[in-house]
């Protein structure tokens, strides 16, 4: 059975830390593929700056030529508010899936819509800082155990980059060299994204 990792996010824009995390998950978790899952309209976030079409184009530009990385457009195709549980339930059943998340997301995982359903269908992998200890809420640990699912650690050194910082730099005409994959930077420049209105 194929082993697929899922990395969700707004990817507004996708940056080098996203790509590095996906590649780390592919290798460390011994996955066959990592699919980047751009949100249509994330329920816990402010409205997105770039259109779905531009975010998809940037993701494709970022992963071109990188074996094992792919894009999953299910949330964008579905549209509306984006809930992880809906994405999970729509997955083909011919693979074993691992949802990749950050330690900050793990801390509030039990507030996600139908989180118990999510853990019945996917394993979890949490990107952790070197030297940190992975701790899940007792109710999450119990639900994973009952579902026969795992919670795995994905050692990952955080990178000093965030999409909001990149958007701010671009709006102010500042340098973003080294923060964006080359194809993403090119798409942003060619389409005038993230410039002040």
UniProtKB/Swiss-Prot annotation:
Keywords associated with the record: ATP-binding, NAD, Nucleotide-binding, Nucleotidyltransferase, Pyridine nucleotide biosynthesis, Transferase
Gene Ontology process terms (BP): NAD biosynthetic process
Known EC number: 2.7.7.18
Reaction(s) this enzyme catalyzes, per UniProt: nicotinate beta-D-ribonucleotide + ATP + H(+) = deamido-NAD(+) + diphosphate
Molecular-function annotations in GO: ATP binding; nicotinate-nucleotide adenylyltransferase activity
Pfam entry (one): CTP_transf_like
Domain of life: Bacteria
Function: Catalyzes the reversible adenylation of nicotinate mononucleotide (NaMN) to nicotinic acid adenine dinucleotide (NaAD).
Protein family per UniProt: Belongs to the NadD family.
Name of the protein in its database record: Probable nicotinate-nucleotide adenylyltransferase
